[in-house]
Amino acid sequence: MQGKTISGYTLKHQLGVGGMAEVWYAENRIHKPAAVKILNMELSQNKNIVDRFSNEAEIMVKLDHPNIRQVYDYGDIEGRPAIVMEYLEGDDLKAMMKQGRRFLKEELEKWWNQMVEALNYTHSIGIVHRDIKPSNIFIDTSGNVRLLDFGIAKNNEGGTGTMTGSTLGTRIYMSPEQVKDPKRVDYRTDLYSLAVTFVHLLTGKAPYDSTTSSDFEIQLSIVTKPLDVSGLPNDWRSFLLPYLEKEAEKRPALQRFNSVSAPVVEEKKESVLDEETVIMNEPPGERKSSDEETDEKKAADEDNHQHSFENDFMDDDYEWVQEFGR
């Protein structure tokens, strides 16, 4: 592949290989960098997956927002579908949590607000992401959010892009309506998933325990049981709870978070968090128990990908891949 060209960008070196695609660093003739995602040869023969890959490209190439990764073009290389995307450096929030990264409260407030801007933009043009989760929220070297991966996005203006018989999304972050019928969700599913994601970020605890619960039990809990938010700081708990309503029509419009004006519940429960930081995992050097390690490993099976500069490109944890890639 080295030396091949697509849309004026020449492939220079491989960044990584994942379950679905390989990713290359590329430059054009004025040395502008790009990342080129190329679907694996075997999957390039699967029409359902090629359609999904094309869906991502067709949606993202239309998007123009500072908090969403830019797609320059798409086409094919040696018969394999390829997407030419903005080259990013930084890390996604899942990778940061795995590294035991401590987040400032100011950072989390900023990232929530930037996600609000990004999602309000996509929703305003009829696009529902349907897979909001930590690994799809990339933080660049300037500390800003870049929303990734519209591979299972729904375009309300041009069809759903949903394949019959598929389960779309990453289970532990799904909304109740997404569990019930992924083809009928609207923008409010993203509100729920974003709130679940921030519960995870703020508490360091995965929303559901895959070690003690079956997939069915997790889905049943999503539909029928309130998410445990007891570990949240008071201001965030009051702010996020409305977005976690089981009935989509009860969720409010996405709003920016302001720690000064955020409502505070009456409960006087003392927070385990200090005033400046939120601990995402135990600090480096602390030993996890074997049960905790097993829990993290099983939870990771719900949302797993290879880590590299462009790890988001190689995320292969979608349920639809399991459905059609057998």
Label every model-predicted segment.
Residues 74:
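Activation-segment/catalytic-loop signature of the eukaryotic protein kinase fold
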Residues 111-112:
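Activation segment signature within eukaryotic-like protein kinase domains
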